[in-house]
């Protein structure tokens, strides 16, 4: 084993994380960037999102803003939030007079475009796209930034017990996949499983490619994260068939998706508490293929529960019906009435998940463990994501409303739309880029200036590739 590989492994080992409150404040930059983008959109709504200056603004807000939050401004997240939102607010207010003048010059076919935009917004739920895109961006940034000293160790994955931003990110990535996954159908189990296996196969292939690459190139590994051979692509790849299997097992029951998720999480947590499973995962020697990958195998149960929770939330969001008209809501648009119901659901869900997590933390005194993906971790991931989903939805309703007096403009930042268009491909490219940079640069000895140049170039490359693919309507399915 090379000394540099050993040093890099030690760099991400034995960590204890940081506070949940700080994680929330740091990741609020996602929301702040969306607010700033929405304000700029309101001022320049009749401009094309492909204008060079707009693309640059978009990239600065939704990529570099997140990068700065976990590097240079990691100790001053409130200041960074202010530096993003205050200039955008001033710029918006300063341009209100110009915006009023431009409204008088709208083209005759404007209302037709507005109707199309309303239909698209109701179908696609723009705030979901912003949420998912932001999740992918911060994930891509973190998997490389963690290898540099400029990335705080408290944000990196903990060894066993504790909370960190990257620990939350892994679970949130799975949760977000569940949110945007297709709802279950009444199709027979056999055809469903066939489709699931077909969907899982390319991702599992990527898992094997990563495994072979890591072993053959003597790349640094954090074995206690998933095991000797297991990696995150295997976790993602096995989700579709097991989700289908769970659907088949619960098909004849009336238990809702969220109930199924909680049952799986609770059953797994009981096994961790009343049997020797927890000790086996944490301390058993790695003597065979199963024990060598015990973390990845058993944590998959928790990730399955998290995915189902995300799927349950996504199903409710996409299937929320308009409330019955009343004198109190007769003046509100159907679009906003629907969003009020969604925000109400997300708020209640977030409160319940937060209360349950606090109960585990204060009464049962079981700590969060991403390595185990135990019940406190499950509750934390669900609480965080329902809270932030509600915030994204509220921002959209308040700052990105559909009104007849405004131009029919995009409702999702272009760089995030582009990332979502080829999400898994961009994630794969981020992993490849991370590997190439680690093999060509001694990340532990890089100066802060050199580090930021590398990270900005990396972000620009990923964003640029996603924009080119999106512009040319090239969707690469894995």
From Swiss-Prot:
Q: In which pathway does it act?
A: Glycolipid biosynthesis; glycosylphosphatidylinositol-anchor biosynthesis
Q: Which InterPro entries match?
A: PIGW/GWT1
Q: Which GO terms describe its biological process?
A: GPI anchor biosynthetic process
Q: Ribosomal protein: is it a keyword of this entry?
A: no
Which Cys pairs are S-S linked?
A: none
Kindly indicate where the leader peptide sits in this chain. Answer: none
Q: Which residues are glycosylated?
A: 367
Similarity comment text for this entry: Belongs to the PIGW family.
Q: What does this protein do?
A: Probable acetyltransferase, which acetylates the inositol ring of phosphatidylinositol during biosynthesis of GPI-anchor.
Name the chain's protein. Answer: GPI-anchored wall transfer protein 1
């Amino acid at each position: 084993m090379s000394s540099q590989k050993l040093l890099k492994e030690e760099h991400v080992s034995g960590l204890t994380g940081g506070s949940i409150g700080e994680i929330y404040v740091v990741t609020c930059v996602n929301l702040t960037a969306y607010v700033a983008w929405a304000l700029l959109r309101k001022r320049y709504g009749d401009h094309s999102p492909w204008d060079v200056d707009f693309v640059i603004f978009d990239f600065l807000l939704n990529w570099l803003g997140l990068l700065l939050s976990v590097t240079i401004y990691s100790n001053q997240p409130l200041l960074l939030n202010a530096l993003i939102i205050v200039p955008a607010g001033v710029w918006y207010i300063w341009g209100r007079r110009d915006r009023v003048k431009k409204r008088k010059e709208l083209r005759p076919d404007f209302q037709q475009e507005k109707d199309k935009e309303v239909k698209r917004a109701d179908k696609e739920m723009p705030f979901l796209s912003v949420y998912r895109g932001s999740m992918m961006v911060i994930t891509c940034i973190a998997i490389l930034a963690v290898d540099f000293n400029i990335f705080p160790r408290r944000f990196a994955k903990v060894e066993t017990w504790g909370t960190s931003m990257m620990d939350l990110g892994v679970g949130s990535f799975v949760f977000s996949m569940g949110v945007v996954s297709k709802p279950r159908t009444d199709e027979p189990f056999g055809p469903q499983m066939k489709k699931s296996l077909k969907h899982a196969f390319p991702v599992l292939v990527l898992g094997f490619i990563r495994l072979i690459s890591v072993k053959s190139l003597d790349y640094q590994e954090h074995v206690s994260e998933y095991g000797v051979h297991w990696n995150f692509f295997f976790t993602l790849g096995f989700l579709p068939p097991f989700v289908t299997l769970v659907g088949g097992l619960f098909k004849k029951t009336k238990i809702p998706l969220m109930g199924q998720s909680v049952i799986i999480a609770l059953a797994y947590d009981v096994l961790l508490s009343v049997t020797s499973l927890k000790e086996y995962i944490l301390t058993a020697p790695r003597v065979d293929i199963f024990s060598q990958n015990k973390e990845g195998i058993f944590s998959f149960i928790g990730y399955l529960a998290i995915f189902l929770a995300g799927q349950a939330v996504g199903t409710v969001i996409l299937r929320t019906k308009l409330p019955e008209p009343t004198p109190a809501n007769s003046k509100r648009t159907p679009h906003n009435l629907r969003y009020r119901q969604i925000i109400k659901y997300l708020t209640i869900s977030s409160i319940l998940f937060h209360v349950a997590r606090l109960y585990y933390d204060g009464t049962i005194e079981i700590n969060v463990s991403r390595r185990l993906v135990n019940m406190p971790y499950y509750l934390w991931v669900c609480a965080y994501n329902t809270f932030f989903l509600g915030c994204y939805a509220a921002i959209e309703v308040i700052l990105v409303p559909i009104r007849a007096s405004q131009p029919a403009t995009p409702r999702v930042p272009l760089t995030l739309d582009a990332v979502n268009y080829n999400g898994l491909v961009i994630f794969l490219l981020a992993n490849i880029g991370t590997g190439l940079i680690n093999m060509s640069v001694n990340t532990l000895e890089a100066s802060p200036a050199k580090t930021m140049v590398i990270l900005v170039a990396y972000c620009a490359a990923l964003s640029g590739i996603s924009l080119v693919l999106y512009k040319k309507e090239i969707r690469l399915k894995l």
